[in-house]
Each structure stands twice: as C-alpha cells, then as structure tokens.
Regions:
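Immediate post-signal peptide segment of exported/extracytoplasmic ligand-binding proteins
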Residues: 41-54, 161-167, 330-333, 347
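Short, well-ordered beta-strand elements
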Residues: 46-61, 79-84, 167-171, 291
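An extracytoplasmic/periplasmic, membrane-proximal ligand-sensing/linker region
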Residues: 50, 61, 188-195, 202-219, ...
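Ligand-binding cleft/hinge of the Venus flytrap
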Residues: 69-77, 163-198
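Ligand-binding pocket segment of bilobal, Venus flytrap-like solute-binding proteins
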Residues: 93-95, 101-105, 179-256
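A conserved helix-loop-strand patch within extracytoplasmic ligand-binding domains
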Residues: 124-174
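A bilobed periplasmic-binding-protein/Venus flytrap-type ligand-binding module shared by bacterial periplasmic
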Residues: 138-148, 271-283, 304-307
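C-terminal lobe and pocket-closing loops
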Residues: 232-295
Length: 347
C-alpha cells in the first residue's frame, strides 16, 4: 500500500456503494413523504387528474426528466403516473398508431423523420416546449484550461496555426456514428491534417470519453469532438471552439459520406422537445401547462449526469438531488395549488 493511499477491497467498495444507494433511496422516500397529501385529499386529486402515461426513454438524461416530471405530477397535481419504457422510434410509432402515450419527453426531433412532421401537421400532437435548452449540443472541444492559457485556440484558425498546443491530434468519432461522417467532411473542408494535426478515429464511445478524461485529469492537451448532455461534459470544463457560421445546406451536405467538395459549417443545436397528444392537451390543460414549463439547460443536465455517475445513483435519486438543490428553477414550473402541496420542499 502506498503512503497516504487507502486501498479498498471489493467488499468494502460494494458496502460504500450500497450505503450511498440506501441514503439516496431514503432521501427519495423522505421527499415523497414531505410532499404527500392526506389519503382523503389524494383520493380527490386522483379523480381530478386521473391516469397519465409518460415515456421513459432508455438513456439517462431522459430518465431524469421523466423522474422529475413524474414526481411533480404525482405529488403536486395528484396524478397516477405510469412511466412507459420506450425509445425514439417506438414512441413516435405508438403516437402514430395508438395515440399514446399521453406525454413523450426528450424527443430528439432530428431522429423522428416524416412521421413526426405528419403528426404535428395533422394536429394529432402538440409540441409543448424544448425540454433541453438549447438542445443537443455538438462541437469540437478543448479543455477550458487550455483556451484560458492560449486564447488564440478559441477558433479553428488558431488551433490549426498552433497544432503543438492541442497535442497535434484530433479525437474523432467511431466508425458508424453519424458524427463521424460530418467530422470527416469537416476535416477535409479545413484541410486539418495538412496543418499538422493527425486524426485519431476512436473504436468506441468509451475510448473517446476516456481519452478526454485522461487528458483532463493530467491537465494535458485534448482536441476532439463531443456532444451533450453527457457525463463528461458535466464533469469537465470544456470550450467549444469557433468553427465559423452555421449553414444549414452545408451541414446537411456534410452528413453524406459521398459529398465531393465539403465546406465548413458549425454544428446546430439539435431540437429536443416534449409533446403531448391533442386529446391529453384538451383533457388535462394544467398538466400540459406544467410539462410546457419543465425545461433544463443542457449544461445543467450534463452536471446532473456527472453527479449521477459519481454517486452511482439511479435516475430517481438524481431527480431528488435536482429537486432539493434547484427549488428556484422548478418552483416556477408549477401552479399555485401545486406550490401549496409541495410547500414543505420549498422551505
């Protein structure tokens, strides 16, 4: 054992993790108890709101959105909420074929195709809000400490003029990812390799994330693609370099591997929304209003994901953490009656 370093056995590690989970689970139970109405009041509220179905998409940020929304609907509005496991394509297909679930949240519009456009145009669904602001973010990033030490690196021109300052390497997406095609075209458009920056194509998302973490923890250069909301973007202070103006036509062309003469364009924010069915909107205007207010900064969600990862927490436990530490944010989402019911949490 090295001096000053404590080595834990696997059993001790599991004990600590399980202890954390017990604490977080207890906190969730306590939070629910604080907000819970009396049995008689709850019965009246349930009859007023009734049953609500909401997607539980199979990625962490969406699960947190659902957990927060479910808690507020149940404890503030007396709803009986069922979280329906789903993904983008199954959710949009179910809306089209079955007019359910009632609420679909963290829907990445760019992945829904023409089905979403038709549902919206036909008035079958109502788009309530951008649940993540400004949406899904993509870019080419440097550690903020590197840009602060060398401000000229804030632009792609500055990076290409100083390849040694960024480690002489660009960390690219794995093969098969959509961002790989865009990045490859951007690399050609900028003549990046001619500036002395080699391109390293990662074999997986895990190695891409690990490369960032290793560089950051050693305060070494790192230059590459990443996106948010994600755990690494919440854990590490990163700066998106200026790639020039966004051009819709150029960006769309860059999504095709056979684009003959690619040009440069920055990445747009991907729209990520919450929608409800038209029928639900009419029957439950107060819940629709609530869900139109439930929105997170993309950076805040990345920080929540980082906290969840560091504490080996569940999505429900991350929701508790958010609710306990961000009252100023979510207290503005709920109506007066819900504020009264949840008053114990707002003290």
């Amino acid at each position: 054992m090295s001096p000053g370093k404590l080595t834990l056995s696997r059993g001790h590690k599991l004990t600590i993790i399980n202890s954390k989970r017990y604490i977080f689970s207890a906190a969730f139970a306590a939070l629910t108890a604080l907000a819970a109405p009396t049995a008689a009041t709850a019965a009246v509220e349930q009859s007023q709101c009734g049953e609500v179905t909401i997607t539980q998409m199979n990625w962490d940020s969406a699960a947190i959105v659902t957990a927060v929304s479910k808690f507020l609907m149940e404890q503030g509005y007396g709803c009986d909420v069922t979280a329906v496991p789903s993904d983008t394509t199954p959710a949009i297909t179910s809306l089209s074929e079955n007019n359910e679930p009632d609420i679909v949240t963290e829907l990445w519009v760019n992945s829904t195709g023409d089905v979403y456009k038709k549902l919206k145009a036909d008035g079958n669904i109502v788009e309530l809000t951008s649940v993540l602001d400004p949406g899904g973010v993509e870019g080419w990033w440097l550690p903020t400490y590197l840009v602060e030490a060398h401000p000229e690196l804030a632009t792609i021109e500055g990076v290409m003029a100083n390849p040694e300052l960024v480690g002489g390497m660009f960390n690219n997406c794995p093969d098969g990812w959509g961002c790989r095609i865009v990045n490859d075209n951007m690399i050609r458009a900028f003549n990046l390799e001619e500036s002395g920056i080699k391109v390293f194509n990662h074999g997986s998302g895990q190695t891409l994330a690990t490369s960032m973490a290793a560089a950051y923890q050693s305060e070494e250069p790192w230059f590459g693609y990443y996106w948010g909301p994600t755990t690494p973007m919440g854990k590490f202070a990163m700066t998106s370099i200026d790639l020039g103006e966004y051009d819709k036509d150029i960006h769309q062309a860059n999504q095709n591997a056979d684009t003959p003469n690619p040009k440069a364009s920055s990445f747009p924010a991907a729209p990520i929304v919450t929608v409800v069915t038209k029928d639900f909107m009419k029957a439950n205007p107060e819940i629709a209003e609530l869900m139109s207010n439930v929105t997170f900064k993309t950076s805040t969600m990345s920080q929540l994901l980082s906290w969840k990862d560091a504490n080996n927490a569940s999505s429900e436990e991350a929701a508790v953490y958010f609710l306990k530490n961000n009252q100023d944010a979510w207290s503005g989402w709920i109506n007066e009656a819900a504020t009264e019911k949840l008053s114990a949490l707002l003290k």
